[in-house]
Amino acid sequence: APRVEGERPQVLTNLQLLRKYPRFVLLLAACALLMACHSSSCTYMIHIVEKAGAGSGAMGAALALAAFLELPAMGLFSRMQQRLSLAWLLRLCAGAFLAKIVVFWLAESMTAIYLASVLQFFEYGIFTPATVYYVVEHIDRGNQVKGQALISVASSGVGSAFGSLCCGLILDRAGVSGMLLFEVACAAAGCVVMLLATGEFTFFCVDMKMMEQRAKNSL
């Protein structure tokens, strides 16, 4: 039944919210995988730059460059959205996550590390506002705060903890190259899940719409 004007929107539990928006569940999974890669690469950055033959000074410069480039990306996000859909921006940032960690994996000099750090503009700089806009556009008004909280838990909580723990264990056993290969796998999986979440594959998009409609009818 249509909602009466002035009526308070229905506030769902976490489980109800995830059932109602199955594509949002995929977005959460993509966020967790991508942030597992991003957070662990920041945590163990000193090992990455040492692999490239540098030290803590170069690490600080690379991290500063990456952090500096996040701000203009966030500031220009609204202009980007005028040219590209939100779905394409999410795919772009997922691709940047993968490209950056692949360059880290292959890097043999600090030049490559610095070039990879430039990708932070398209990576985390777009990721943060894009996920906020996704919730605003796809989650009903009464549950947007809960949606934002779930994204924070999936990315900064589950993803970061999973990535740091696994990469720490792999670093001890397989070295920096093994750790970076694991991060590449996480980023690649995150890209695939992001494509599914944003409806890139038509057959999957149709199935998601059917699931969402069934969930709405059951609430």
Predicted regions span which residues?
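Short amphipathic helix-loop junctions that connect adjacent transmembrane helices
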Residues: 40-59
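Structural signature of the two symmetry-related core transmembrane helices
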Residues: 88-103, 184
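Pair of pore-lining "gating" transmembrane helices in MFS-fold secondary transporters
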Residues: 19-41, 118-122
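A membrane-interface helix-boundary motif in multi-pass transporters
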Residues: 168-189
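Helix-to-loop junctions at the C-terminal end of transmembrane segments
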Residues: 72-86, 171-172
